[in-house]
């Protein structure tokens, strides 16, 4: 499912201020030298590519889950339209600095995939767009975003799914193979973004977030499981997790944590490799690996959704947003988004 770009509602009021970096563009718009769409293109564009970790989703009945998967845009830690006060998304934080255009590309159940691999029936029903499709969406857009945030790969660490019996006994080689497959597929599509960025006449910053801290996360999950043991009305869909993500079963968690750690090392090395190939030769591209999500403390039950005890609660979304934003300063500085973009006090 594709999403429409979100434009800061008060952008015209803000760019009309004489101190705005976009005031000259606003005057051109007032003189009808450029259109409203052309004015919007001058604003910083921020995109989020990712999976369910980036989305406001939880599992319940099949029909409700299907409906939610198709309506959950703009209800997460990247972008929350009409957000309640207790929810502070990345887009909302950046809006305090500058009016912007936010583009949410993440997909429920999304995988780091091979471009020509066939999706399973469940993901086709949900309208899932895997990493290759999300990248293709950005490349087809009229304008490549200035800041591209990527947090994907969590669905690729379900190592027990379709696992041969022998690999349950000795899983190390399987974990190595899965982490390497993810790296190769990730690298292929990231290179497509970098190739496009190299042709741009302006700066582009890309942040690759490592997978979340599963060791900490499972402490929160265990706390939720203990609460459900004492009160079965809590987390009513908690056991459904195992139907969709086999490796969340307690028996398989240790190796899931191992695999996620291996993936993060691969992603870090991949970024260093691509920096040598692209960034060191092209001054207007910045590519960074961030461990902000990989080190965030997710070890509390209240960070999990009260229905499935799997996806993030409102408080969980805030923790993820705060972690992700905490490591954006180098990218914002590279793009020139900072004090000069802050609205003047009234």
Name each model feature, range by range.
Residues 62-188:
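Conserved SGNH/GDSL esterase-like catalytic core that processes O-acyl groups on lipids
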Residues 45-57, 101-106, 146-151, 156-158, ...:
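Structural recognition of the beta-strand scaffold that forms the well-ordered cores
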Residues 217-288, 314:
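Substrate-gating cap/lid alpha-helix
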Residues 1-101, 144, 331-346:
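N-terminal secretory targeting modules
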Residues 304-346:
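Histidine-centered active-site loop/cap adjacent to the catalytic His
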Residues 99, 199-204:
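A short helix->loop->beta-strand "cap" motif at the edges of active sites that frequently abuts
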Residues 77-81, 250-258, 304-314:
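Active-site rim elements
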Residues 49-63, 157-159, 210-234:
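Short, solvent-exposed beta-strand-terminating loops
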